[in-house]
């Protein structure tokens, strides 16, 4: 009971924090990940399954520790820093790590057609699109709270799962088997069940405007994810760090706009890094690494794996919070976790015959 | 919210009413069902699927109207009659309907080895076993409430779903595919989710004795159901009405014992039918017909179909109650219903290759 109450307050912050950060929710390889990445380019057939597992595990662990860090930072006191500068820092850090990884690749393999930074207008012209989609979604987020309260918004966010599945099918033209579709519906129902709390029923009183906005936001978010996958997969031999560099450049650009619009005065008067603590730095580092993991998952797996990974992370966070913060798990959480587990199982056994 | 509160009080009564009635939860053919039954014996191969669907639908509709009748009778006032005499009446009515159906069969087909009432000791000796199992379970029911409250008991009752599946596999040696097992776990989780209410979390505080008793009760109930199926299916050509007649004779016998133990004085002083109203008669009729439907499902389908049927009936009851009694459905109900629906779908697509 206590767990859910605190979690709801927290997860709203996770939402605002995470969603505004989303333009850069793609990746680059951190120094430690670089080597596996660059070798993977060479012998990718053999290592593909291994790589897929590693990036999925990394995303799951990073996403779950992300929520825990936010709870921890909240317990330590209120946010003193401006969220927009933190998001910009995340983008900048990812951009920097991309360049470091690229530099190492250039040193070991030399500059090739696939790993050189310079690009054509045709190639780069699609890169701002995900960032624009996330920006529109973040704008809508300010308006939806006129119709929906924060816990109800948490529930409605699970529509993302369905929209990602549908757009993945339509845009990337990849097939899911009937059992995998059933598993996807279960994933959505299971995640929502795990998040149920005594005030969840409010969501049923959501007015039609709220529903429309929630659905539009889910579509925008799903579209941005699927579009990013399409960009990254369009040229499989292209170095992921170059692709990320260009994605993050636009992420920085759009976050710069956000700083100017929202926090211009605060940054001018108090400075860019005002209120940053050790935990703020940890959170920025975690977000940057999570971004890397998301991008890796997009390159070596797909959006479906990403959705499963972040859903399992949500459950992991709750379980870890029991030990770290003494939260209590509800019966709904156990039931939702059971449904999510069965969904993961069904997704893996329900592969369509000529998979991928 | 209101729905769930009222439903919990009611469904506890459903429990006590239904469980004590259970020894006779098998069937005979009502006059209208008789013809389809007797013809089915002849051309059973062709009509098997049709018959299976009809009996399943009948069971679903009768079970859902059963709970509605109980809510209705409660609204009309408290039970004035003794539950044990009502249960005895249900058994007696089913016994009578069995005999009527048999009489019609004898007239049309003559007395054969398969439809004659007389039996060997070997054949009849197994018939009291389900009744004994239900009696032990009903005895346990009086003690479990020392450890578990009524809403928590409602939640724990869903263990029946799992125990039925496991015992069905072990005793009847029938195979479920992996996907069907997954579907069965989902059915249990979905039904429990649909019944969640703000006080459901109490169940997590159930002491170990409560868990043990709940599991033993689930096993007894599952065993009784599976054993009944084994008895009925042992001799497929045997007329179902003869099989039911002997089951119900023992049902009457054990209910007679229950009357003597619980309500002897009341029956002696006020009479057997004291407090019976029009709705009491309707309920007895409904219980008798539900018993018929369960028995038909055992003969022409199986325990798994029975569990699905009664689970869907539980959801139907809730939806119908919205219109009849102005109940409100919770978000948990929608989520649980979604999971149950997906489970039904998975059970049907997940058939093992050489099914049955």
From Swiss-Prot, chains A, B:
SUPFAM superfamilies: Multidrug resistance efflux transporter EmrE. Pfam families: Nuc_sug_transp. It is a multi-pass membrane protein. The keyword Kinase does not apply. It is found in: Golgi apparatus membrane. One of its GO terms (molecular function) is pyrimidine nucleotide-sugar transmembrane transporter activity. Expressed in roots, leaves and stalks. This is CMP-sialic acid transporter 2. It comes from Oryza sativa subsp. japonica.
């Amino acid at each position: 009971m206590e767990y859910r109450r605190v979690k709801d307050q927290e997860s709203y912050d996770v939402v605002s924090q995470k969603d505004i950060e989303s333009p850069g929710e793609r990746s680059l390889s951190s120094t430690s990940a670089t080597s596996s990445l660059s070798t993977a380019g060479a012998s990718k057939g053999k290592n593909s399954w291994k790589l897929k597992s590693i990036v999925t595990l990394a995303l799951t662990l990073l996403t779950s520790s992300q929520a825990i860090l936010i709870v921890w930072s909240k317990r330590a006191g209120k946010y003193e820093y401006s969220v927009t500068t933190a998001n910009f820092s995340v983008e900048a850090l990812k951009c920097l790590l991309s360049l470091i990884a690229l530099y190492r690749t250039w040193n070991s393999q030399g500059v090739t057609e696939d790993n050189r930074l310079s690009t054509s207008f045709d190639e780069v012209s699609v890169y701002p699109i995900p960032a624009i989609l996330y920006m529109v979604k973040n704008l809508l987020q300010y308006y939806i709270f006129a119709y929906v309260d924060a816990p109800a918004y948490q529930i409605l966010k699970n529509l993302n799962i369905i929209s990602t599945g549908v757009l993945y099918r339509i845009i990337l033209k990849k097939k899911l088997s009937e059992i995998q579709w059933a598993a996807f519906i279960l994933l959505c129902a299971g995640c929502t069940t795990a998040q149920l709390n005594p005030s969840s029923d409010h969501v049923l009183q959501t007015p039609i405007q709220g529903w429309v906005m929630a659905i539009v936001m889910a579509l925008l978010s799903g579209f941005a994810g699927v579009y990013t996958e399409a960009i990254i997969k369009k040229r499989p031999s292209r170095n992921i760090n170059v692709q990320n560099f260009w994605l993050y450049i636009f992420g920085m650009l759009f976050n710069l706009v956000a700083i100017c619009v929202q926090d211009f005065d605060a940054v001018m008067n108090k400075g860019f890094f005002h209120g940053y603590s050790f935990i703020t730095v940890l959170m920025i580092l975690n977000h940057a690494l999570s971004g890397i993991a998301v991008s890796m998952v997009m390159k070596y797996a797909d959006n479906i794996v990403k959705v499963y990974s972040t859903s399992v992370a949500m459950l992991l966070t709750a379980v870890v919070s029991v030990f770290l913060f003494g939260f209590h798990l509800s019966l709904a959480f156990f039931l939702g976790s059971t449904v999510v587990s069965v969904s993961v199982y069904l997704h893996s056994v329900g592969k369509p015959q000529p998979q991928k």
